[in-house]
């Protein structure tokens, strides 16, 4: 369930981003599904061109065709904020459906953010995306314009975490999407089945309807704003940055592993009048972060507050430090934010996660920034 990078694992080196090495056809099963359903203009798997950039025309056609196949009504374009991460278009050969959707720049390359936004619209979850944005902003937390659609896309499993040795395949929200990424997402959507009250789409809408954050103090808002600003960044083994890093011999454009995400928010990020906040967390790994806090200061599940760092162990609350394998940041009302298989994403502290919750720590209190 969690990305392997949260546990001890060997990492083989991979090709660097932008190298001449042919990218593996990692989405072959999903591409076959897309071709079978006559999506994205491809007539065969062999002619699909998975590593080509996704164009505006192809994405518009895909969204329209998914609406037709799923029976979802057309929805207005998602507009929580004007788009801010559009990639300038360049001329690219594009395949289209028989009746192409009308777009202003057919050959323009589409970003990962634009891919997720279009697909969330196509499956009728625009309102859900807006409700996640509204829930955060109502609590005074600033969020990027992509926040709602990225939360929804990841709750639906529309993104794939590539193996650590292939972290060069990971794409940031602002990076041009590939046809393979679009095919993976489309195949996931087609797997949801009937659109009834028990469907995955209906469940995500229900979660959005109830998304409310508790009252936050100023420091909690600052911490969550930084954490939320990373929504949609990919999971990268050893990653701690939005920018290019070489982690364990693999060049990645940017991203975070579970402890790297917490490290960025509390250790590397600078805040006005932060006092000793950056020195509260000393260790870089999940294990060291978890054992730095004495047992008497560990936070139980029922006592969690927003901006607490939370840890998960193989034996839940009976875990010791050596059994801790994952970490995240508590958001409030049963939600937390993490970097895992879905990249940086919101998740509910229920079920599998609740059973493995070990303890939390409160860096804001440790730094003397709140009682």
Enumerate the predicted regions with their spans.
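Feature responds to low-complexity, polar/acidic, surface-exposed segments characteristic
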Residues: 1, 13-28, 40-60, 64-149, ...
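Non-catalytic ligand/cofactor/substrate-binding and regulatory segments of enzyme domains
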Residues: 194-235, 356-371
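Solvent-exposed, polar/charged alpha-helical surfaces in well-ordered, non-transmembrane soluble domains
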Residues: 28-36, 57, 61, 113, ...
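Bacterial N-terminal signal peptides
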Residues: 2-10
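Sec-exported extracytoplasmic/periplasmic mature domains
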Residues: 35-39, 64-72, 120-128, 154-158, ...
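Catalytic cysteine-centered active-site loop
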Residues: 236-306, 317, 355
């Amino acid at each position: 369930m969690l990305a392997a990078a949260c546990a001890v694992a060997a990492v083989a080196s991979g090709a660097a981003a932008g190298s001449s090495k042919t990218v593996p056809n990692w989405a072959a099963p999903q591409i076959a599904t897309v071709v079978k359903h006559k999506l994205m203009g491809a007539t065969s798997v062999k002619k699909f061109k998975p590593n080509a950039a996704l164009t505006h025309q192809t994405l518009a056609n895909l969204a329209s065709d998914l609406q037709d196949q799923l029976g979802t009504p057309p929805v207005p374009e998602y507009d929580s904020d004007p788009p801010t991460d559009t990639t300038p278009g360049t001329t690219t050969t594009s395949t289209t459906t028989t009746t192409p959707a009308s777009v202003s720049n057919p050959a323009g390359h589409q970003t990962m953010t634009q891919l997720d936004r279009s697909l969330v619209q196509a499956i009728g979850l625009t309102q859900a995306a807006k409700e996640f944005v509204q829930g955060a902003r109502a609590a005074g937390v600033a969020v990027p314009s992509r926040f709602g659609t990225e939360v929804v896309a990841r709750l639906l499993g529309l993104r794939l975490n590539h193996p650590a040795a292939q972290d060069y395949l990971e794409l940031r929200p602002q990076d041009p999407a590939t046809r393979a990424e679009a095919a993976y997402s489309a195949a996931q959507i087609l797997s949801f089945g009937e659109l009834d009250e028990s469907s995955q789409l209906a469940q995500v809408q229900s979660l959005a309807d109830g998304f409310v954050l508790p009252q936050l103090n100023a420091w909690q808002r600052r911490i969550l704003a930084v954490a939320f600003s990373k929504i949609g960044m990919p999971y990268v083994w050893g990653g701690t940055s939005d920018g290019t890093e070489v982690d364990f011999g693999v060049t990645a454009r940017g991203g975070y592993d579970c402890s790297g995400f917490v490290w960025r928010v509390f250790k590397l990020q600078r805040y006005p009048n932060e006092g000793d906040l950056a020195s509260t967390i000393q260790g870089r790994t999940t294990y060291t972060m978890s054992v730095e806090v004495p047992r008497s200061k560990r936070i139980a599940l029922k006592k969690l507050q927003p901006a607490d760092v939370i840890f998960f162990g193989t034996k839940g609350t009976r875990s010791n430090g050596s059994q801790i394998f994952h970490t995240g940041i508590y958001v409030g009302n049963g939600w937390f934010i993490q970097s895992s298989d879905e990249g940086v994403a919101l998740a509910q502290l229920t079920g599998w996660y609740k059973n493995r919750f070990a303890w939390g720590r409160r860096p804001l209190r440790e730094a003397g920034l709140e009682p």
